[in-house]
Amino acid sequence: MDEDEKDRAKRASRNKSEKKRRDQFNVLIKELSSMLPGNTRKMDKTTVLEKVIGFLQKHNEVSAQTEICDIQQDWKPSFLSNEEFTQLMLEALDGFVIVVTTDGSIIYVSDSITPLLGHLPADVMDQNLLNFLPEQEHSEVYKILSSHMLVTDSPSPEFLKSDNDLEFYCHLLRGSLNPKEFPTYEYIKFVGNFRSYNNVPSPSCNGFDNTLSRPCHVPLGKDVCFIATVRLATPQFLKEMCVADEPLEEFTSRHSLEWKFLFLDHRAPPIIGYLPFEVLGTSGYNYYHIDDLELLARCHQHLMQFGKGKSCCYRFLTKGQQWIWLQTHYYITYHQWNSKPEFIVCTHSVVSYADVRVERRQELALEDPPTEAMHPSAVKEKDSSLEPPQPFNALDMGASGLPSSPSPSASSRSSHKSSHTAMSEPTSTPTKLMAENSTTALPRPATLPQELPVQGLSQAATMPTALHSSASCDLTKQLLLQSLPQTGLQSPPAPVTQFSAQFSMFQTIKDQLEQRTRILQANIRWQQEELHKIQEQLCLVQDSNVQMFLQQPAVSLSFSSTQRPAAQQQLQQRPAAPSQPQLVVNTPLQGQITSTQVTNQHLLRESNVISAQGPKPMRSSQLLPASGRSLSSLPSQFSSTASVLPPGLSLTTIAPTPQDDSQCQPSPDFGHDRQLRLLLSQPIQPMMPGSCDARQPSEVSRTGRQVKYAQSQVMFPSPDSHPTNSSASTPVLLMGQAVLHPSFPASRPSPLQPAQAQQQPPPYLQAPTSLHSEQPDSLLLSTFSQQPGTLGYAATQSTPPQPPRPSRRVSRLSES
């Protein structure tokens, strides 16, 4: 009994321990099964153990390979992995890793090419390197890549194992969001060496498969690649952040209506680098890219109108001075009591450069017609054969070859649109190569005058500028034919993509030339209209006849067309006034004096000519009241048309001797009416300031005989003129209407005889004044403040030196 009980107890304890062990084993197998990927069905214990064993084996192999390939130098931090360290090194060097075969095919490129050159790795891989180089550098870069292949069919192992670093400079095409923009090239430096690999992928159709001949190809399985680090010649201080394909990253912020930060959540610092207290109170526009400000302003205006919306993709400046692409969904929150806008809630999402480029190109495709020529970088997405872009032949590229000296380009992502420059010469400063605007290489047909009147420009802008298309097309063809021999556009026929790019460039040239031609034609039309207006004014002035009548006490301007021979001889023989200015009147017809050209009527009605008078009083020297009758022979153009008085007009004062009033009465010689005309023979000049003090000797004989006037004279009274007494009479030249003296009958015009017209000397502009001594004061004109748009005249007189004289009253032309 006792033994059976003992055996039963041992068996129970054994079963209990076995059950415990089995339960523990099942738990462990279950845990392993849950850790294995792809466990969609329930696996038995054997399958679970097999998969675990396989995973451990692969893990050991990968660890062994990683230890072999990992950097073991002391300068690599131990807390960084190989991938992290490589990424940091490439960012610090402003470069990327590229693997190129000997024929130029790109088989690998790192992701850091996107923030540096704007290309996606998928677009660059499987393409030829020559597609991204200017045509001038194709031959040299190809020789560098295939130089070691020309010695033997295959490189020696010693050549591949040696540290034969190869360095060269070239220009590389920069990617763009808009494929229609002119290509821009960045000056870069290649540093690398050749290595042999067994599993190099064969390139697909890239347009350069048949570049190398058969003997130069390396045997299959021993391909040689050029592994290089590509660096920018000039480092970029601001560049885009390389965003990997990670789960959606977003953060929330709150802004005021003035777009200032009010709140920033905890998810923002890992993305943008700023802590909340660093951005609170600052404007969001301080962190936006300058090229995106216009688009963001439109989105914010849409938000203020509709209360919610979605922004475009824009660049945000991080704390590490890098641009990260964001897209924002926002809405306006209102106060719960007064329903007034309180603040704006924004949810910012990180977007990749690939998504941004797709969105931008879709927008451009919607805005632009589909027939527009596309940039070669856009054609690459369609897996088409890409040749070197040919439009560079038609442009002024500056240098024909590769610069021998390193010339880094000073460029940044924030200024790529405005820093397009031509490729530098070998001795020039480092610049960025781009295909310049097409009009810079073509000869300009004409240049607009730099100093055009503002009024003329406004008239030219409002005039119709319709232009015949045939003339512009002929001009464009002629300019292109002239530029083709110089730029070397004599290459074989290009593919369709190149032809479309050339056609787009030529169309741009044509449009610019047509616009320039329209501006020139508008300017020519404006000048023709101005010339026509001047001709009309000259015809109007020539047709107008102004008659002037002499009034006894008043000073008048008389242009004696015919003077007595005795007076003429006396005036010509007197040497006292050798430099007396004369009014030269051109007579187009014999016996007829040219028509008077009056100065601006508005100015003449406001000005009075005051003559100097001596202290000796004259009897009956008061101004007669202006007669209300106007001459019937006075043309209507006198009151409506404002003409210009030539600057060469000189005023000569003829002062009669103090005689009785009866002697001042007109003689029978005044019975003949004469036509009074002036011709605009010289350009207009303003009055000189010193003309008011000029004096000249009188042309009156010492015997007291007054020079007879053979021509009727006219008075133009001003409405503000008043008669004065005989002791202080102030004769005033009154313009505006003709006054007929009551003692003079209306005279009829009589033509001159041909003989008299031939012998007639140039008439003088004369005005009689009162005389105090033998040599009276001449008619003195003072300057006036010329109003804008009015034309003035100057009475230029020569003043010979004279001894001091008694004080006289100076005649002046003053404003009324």
From Swiss-Prot:
Origin superkingdom: Eukaryota
Pfam (any one): HLH
GO MF entry, a single one: metal ion binding
Segments of skewed composition (Basic and acidic residues): 1-10
Gene3D superfamilies: Helix-loop-helix DNA-binding domain, PAS domain
UniProt biased composition (Basic residues): 806-816
Record protein name field: Neuronal PAS domain-containing protein 2
Organism per entry: Mus musculus (Mouse)
